[in-house]
Amino acid sequence: MAPKKHSAFMVFVTEWRNHNVEGRRMTLPQAVSHCGTIWEKMTAQQRGPYQSGAKDADVADRAKRERLNCHGQGIAQVDQVQKEAAESLMHMKRSTERLVINAKKSHDLENAKFVFATFNYFTKALTTDVYVPAEFAACEYSLKEGIRSIYSSMIDPGQIIFGQGSDALHHSSTTHDLPLPPNALGEKNMAKLYRNIIDYLTKCQGGDKPLIVFTPAENIAMVKSCFRYLECEDDSKDGGRTIQVFDIEYLLFILKKEVMDVADLNDEKINKFVTDAFFKKDFFEFTAGIACQYHEDNDRTKYCTQSMVTRWAYTFSDFMCGDLAITVQPGKHIPAHTKPNYRIISSDASSLAHESSFDSFYSLPGSRVKKENQSEDVLLSSSRPSVESSSYTPTDHTAFTADLSKLCEFPSLGMRNSSKHRGLDVSAQRERNAGAWNLPTHSRSIQKFSDNDFSVTGADGKHKN
């Protein structure tokens, strides 16, 4: 059913009641009756504004109202946000793939440079995505050279969001343990810090290339917000250059696939879930000497941004340098100091004390040498003393001592031995069981007693009575 159209006359009645004291005292039927005589005397020119107002009201009614979801948000607005997020994700993936594939086409994949970056923050606004930064670190990395350079700085924002001091204190005490403003450490000039970061990224990636940093997916929103926090204090805007933040886990997946393709290795078992699981294991989490001095002194190296970007670089090297036969360098691809945690056992038992090998946990090709001609007996003799050389004499404690080669002795379910074999074998069985201590009761020798061996005191008296 089509909606009713507005009447120009009713528009006139409504306006007359609103502008006249007498009209406000009347009911609607009375006002319609009174305005009818006035409407008849009006010219077409006088009625024109009311007719236009009626048409405008019709148009407004025909306009659809925006539908809302259960949270009171406009559905069209929510769809637009989701569409922009999907486009941003697709742009990130395509840009990452383009970086890796271009390096592969130029036969320079091992020298491709990537920048890993992350922030620590004091607190986050309750209703917006504003983060107050506390610490920043970035690392320039390539497969061949490992860690090329590291930029790290603590940040003193001067103040935190009003009313969130308790949240900031709780977050700091449970993570990075940095002192809160006004006692915060580090750079106080946000504009200067942002320009220093821009200069470092430009030096790493070149002035004509977009500034791209990689960080874990769960930190992307936080890192973008912290960059905006620093950028808003910079009036120069540095020529309008912005920093793009991409997913480091997707970079690991794409880079691993291309590295295995270059090395002519089978990559059927490599997928996004495998690479994500490898990255999240964080094998180098407790490596000493890679965090800043403050976090080293306070035993919070796990949450230090400098330690984070360094561990990510070590993870990339551990996962892919072996595929390209790249020799790892301590301090660049792996920690500078490692602890031996295994040894290679030689086939010669006498050389055990002389041939212990340095070991690390890293997946380097040829790190474990296995000799095919090494027999199992030699390995057993080299790892434990032999039986012949020991003074221990084994003793048979077998509970079942019957001869299973005889049909009559073979145990059966719900069946007794035949009577013709029982009498012949009982004496032989008892002789075999004479020295056994752990036999069941029915297998032990039974001493025969006569009736005279059993007597009950007072029994004779009772019979006499």
Curated annotation (Swiss-Prot):
GO molecular function term, any single one: transcription cis-regulatory region binding
One cellular-component annotation, GO: perinuclear region of cytoplasm
Annotated localization: Cytoplasm; Nucleus
Record feature DNA-binding region, as residue ranges: 2-69
Pfam families the UniProt entry points to: Maelstrom
Biased composition annotated in UniProt, kind: Low complexity: 381-391
Family matches, as InterPro entries: HMG_box_dom_sf, Maelstrom, Protein_maelstrom
Bias kind Basic and acidic residues: ranges: 422-433
Region (Disordered): 373-394, 419-443
Keyword Nucleus recorded: yes
Keywords, alphabetical: Cytoplasm, Developmental protein, Differentiation, DNA-binding, Meiosis, Nucleus, Oogenesis, Repressor, RNA-mediated gene silencing, Transcription, Transcription regulation
Main localization, broad class: cytoplasm
Function: Involved both in the piRNA and miRNA metabolic processes. As a component of the meiotic nuage, plays a central role during oogenesis by repressing transposable elements and preventing their mobilization, which is essential for the germline integrity. Repression of transposable elements is mediated via the piRNA metabolic process, which mediates the repression of transposable elements during meiosis by forming complexes composed of piRNAs and Piwi proteins and governs the repression of transposons.
Protein name in the entry: Protein maelstrom
Naturally occurring in which organism (per UniProt): Drosophila erecta
UniProt lineage: Eukaryota, Metazoa, Ecdysozoa, Arthropoda, Hexapoda
